[in-house]
UniProtKB/Swiss-Prot annotation:
Gene3D superfamilies: dsDNA mimic, putative. Belongs to the putative dsDNA mimic protein family. Pfam families: DUF440 (PF04269). InterPro entries: dsDNA_mimic_put (IPR007376), Put_dsDNA_mimic_sf (IPR036763). It comes from the Bacteria. This is Putative double-stranded DNA mimic protein MS1016. It comes from Mannheimia succiniciproducens (strain KCTC 0769BP / MBEL55E). May act as a double-stranded DNA (dsDNA) mimic. Probably regulates the activity of a dsDNA-binding protein.
C-alpha cells in the first residue's frame, strides 16, 4: 500500500525555510556573511524553491527520496538573476505530521 504524500506548495516551503534561516543563521554563518546578507537582501536577496537534488546523501549521510522532500535555497542573486552566493540549502520533508529538515550552511 502506497501512502499519498501531500507535497508542500512552493510558498509554504519557502516560508518554512526562511523562518528557520532567520532563527539559525546567527549560530551557523560567519558574522561577515550575516552582515552581507542583511545589507544586500533588500536589493539582491532571494529564497528559491528548486528541484530537489538527488545527492543529499553526500551532505547528510543518508539516502533520501527526492519526491518526499522540498529543496529551498537562501542567498543573493547577481545582475543576471542567478543565485551566486548561497547562504543555506534546505531539505524539508513534505510530511506535515513528521516535518524534518536538513540544512547545509555556507562555509
Amino acid at each position: 500500500m502506497t501512502v499519498q504524500i501531500n507535497k508542500l506548495d512552493p510558498d509554504a516551503a519557502i516560508d518554512i525555510a526562511y523562518d528557520i534561516f532567520l532563527e539559525m543563521a546567527p549560530e551557523n554563518l560567519d558574522p561577515a556573511d550575516i552582515m552581507l546578507f542583511n545589507l544586500q537582501f533588500e536589493e539582491r536577496g532571494a529564497v528559491e524553491f528548486v528541484e530537489t537534488a538527488d545527492n543529499w546523501d553526500e551532505e547528510i549521510g543518508v539516502l533520501i527520496d527526492p519526491d518526499e522532500y522540498a529543496e529551498v535555497w537562501v542567498g543573493l542573486v547577481n545582475e543576471n538573476d542567478e543565485m551566486d552566493d548561497i547562504f543555506a540549502k534546505f531539505l524539508i520533508s513534505h510530511r506535515e505530521d513528521d516535518r524534518e529538515f536538513h540544512v547545509v550552511w555556507k562555509e
